[in-house]
Amino acid sequence: MKFIEIQNEVIAKYRINLCDGTKCKNDWSRTHAHPQKRRVCKWKQVNSVESTFTLLHEIGHIENNNSKMRRCEEEYYATAWAIGIMKQYGIADKISEKTKALYQNYILNERDRGIRRGGANYPTKEQLTLDW
């Protein structure tokens, strides 16, 4: 199965609307999700593992939408969801080490930023470590 076929299948299965960014109130520069509207904006469909993982990560935000989560937890659960779907399709092993490091570091940086800002009872780094 090609990556574009997987992308289209997942978009249909999870009832995701795509937007070029013209419906956004904020001028976001990168791909992002609007969970209440089940919308992913500014995602470019390309037949690649990176494009597929980006889409799945944003759908992960939609599928794991919980306003009580901290940012690091939102990112962790969205990424973990994306990894799970990649595993279901048998393509998780195609995610590059660079991409893995980027997502993991982003989660841990969000955790550290929350703690620096006075947040308490944050998950440990071990609890936020992704299982690739």
Question: What annotation goes with each model-predicted range?
Answer:
Residues N65-Y89:
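Post-HEXXH active-site segment of zinc metalloproteases
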Residues I6-V10, E58, I85, L102:
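Charge-rich, solvent-exposed alpha-helical interaction surfaces
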Residues V46-N47, Q88-W132:
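Long, well-structured alpha-helical subdomains associated
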Residues V49-E50, E73:
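Residue signature of alpha-solenoid helical repeat architecture, marking inter-repeat boundaries
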